[in-house]
Amino acid sequence: MKLFELKPAPGAKKRPKRVGRGESSGHGKTSTRGHKGQWARSGGGVRPGFEGGQMPLTRRIPKRGFKNINKKVYTEVNVEKLERFENDTVITPELLLKEGVISKIEKDGVKVLGRGDLTKRLIVRVQKVSEGARKKIEAVGGKVEVI
């Protein structure tokens, strides 16, 4: 197969409807729009969500909940992900980002959680650490520093 031999699959290209090209075409005069009315006009139609004057769904349903602007948001990392680092490595949010362990640092920083096992002795400097993670890090001789 060569580049010039490529062509669309059968039925993939549909000819556009040619309207307003004479009565004998079958799509002349009103160009398939019918007579007068909102839909016959240029720019005609209703805005999205308009239900003809009936109270729209978005206004019939009650409002619920809110966004708490004071909510703490952390990027979570389990101790099993820290197993890839060498002994005595200082683990910081920047290092985790650089090594691809996390894809971004959330506004309140990084929190280390306790899922998985850890055998390496690490120095972990992050914004928050769960109790289980702290025990696992310290059990293998590592240190936890909350920054």
Swiss-Prot record:
Keywords: Ribonucleoprotein, Ribosomal protein, RNA-binding, rRNA-binding
PROSITE patterns in the cross-refs: RIBOSOMAL_L15
Chain intervals with Gly residues compositional bias: 42-52
Superkingdom, taxonomy of origin: Bacteria
Gene Ontology CC entries for this record: cytosolic large ribosomal subunit
Alphabetical list of Pfam families matching this protein: Ribosomal_L27A
Statement: the UniProt record of this protein carries the keyword rRNA-binding: yes
GO molecular function annotation: rRNA binding; structural constituent of ribosome
Subunit structure: Part of the 50S ribosomal subunit.
Full protein name: Large ribosomal subunit protein uL15
Upper classification of the organism: Bacteria, Bacillati, Bacillota, Bacillota incertae sedis, Caldicellulosiruptorales
